[in-house]
Amino acid sequence: MRTSNKLLSCVSALLAAGAAQADSSDPIIAPIHNWSSQIVMSHVIGKIFESQGNHVEYVTTDSQAVYESVRLGDVTFEPEVWEGAFGASFRAALEKGGIEDVATHQAVTREDWWYPMWTKDACPGLPDWQALNDCAAKFATPETGDKGRFLGGPVDWLKHDAEKVEALGMNFQVVNAGSAAAIWAELAAAEKDKTPVVVFNWTPNFAEAVWPGEFVNFPEWVEGCDTDPAVGPVPDKTFDCGNPANGYLKIAAWEGMKEKWPTSYAALQKVTFTNAQIAEMAKLVDIDEMEPEDAAQAWLDANEVVWKPWTE
């Protein structure tokens, strides 16, 4: 019995020595938004932090207001800062202070008007935006009357599509989807009889593996075309341009993270995902119909060679 007790004591000591120690008793706060890759990625990174001994809580947050929340320390980090959708909010928070640009993903992003390839059969001048406008009547619905219907992203993504339509004099009406899932449902419904459709889309995600398509080519985005009427092809208008065609995808963090959770902060600095990896995260939820937490664990299990070095 004495030998057994000694053995148990030794095992317990080894387990205690091997267990990761929390940087703080307070939880790291991870944000949850309304598109699949971000939700899965938050859980992937959160589980990595948990493997380091830290506690993580997940909170649903507005995808624009989150930068103010991170700046104030109410949310600890943001794993998907898309240049096109959230660059302005991110820059504004950086100027105020309290938030850091921690890392840049390998992924290159694009966010803009997009159509599945069957739409090009109905409007062969695509992807030129003027050709799209000439075909506006083919996208009209009872909801939009004689104007073409563009299905935009959720309102909180702040894509300024209505401003773009007005600036470029397009015969389109913007209708905002309630969620990313509503956009995929629109495409699935249109595919059945090859109805021409133009929607907001972005890369990386899983969609082009299911529905091959193209982005609409608007006047090229240049710095200031969204804020300065003098920049861009229409002299007195802002948003007379597309979104960045090669946008960044960054990671932001509360500046107090490095002192409060130094182990996880060091790991976060090393985190970087490719377009293919992010698309896979979205696919696990949107195609394979996994719960985001399960998708995150599946991704971690299949990709230890990718993320383990981030914790070393």
Where would I find each of the regions flagged by the language model?
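Immediate post-signal peptide segment of exported/extracytoplasmic ligand-binding proteins
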Residues: 21-29, 49-50, 140-147, 305-312
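Short, well-ordered beta-strand elements
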Residues: 23-37, 54-59, 147-151, 268
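An extracytoplasmic/periplasmic, membrane-proximal ligand-sensing/linker region
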Residues: 26-28, 37, 157-173, 177-194, ...
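Pocket-flanking alpha-helical
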Residues: 42, 59-97, 186-188, 206-211
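Ligand-binding pocket segment of bilobal, Venus flytrap-like solute-binding proteins
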Residues: 75-79, 149-227
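A conserved helix-loop-strand patch within extracytoplasmic ligand-binding domains
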Residues: 98-150
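A bilobed periplasmic-binding-protein/Venus flytrap-type ligand-binding module shared by bacterial periplasmic
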Residues: 111-122, 247-260, 283-284
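C-terminal lobe and pocket-closing loops
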Residues: 207-267
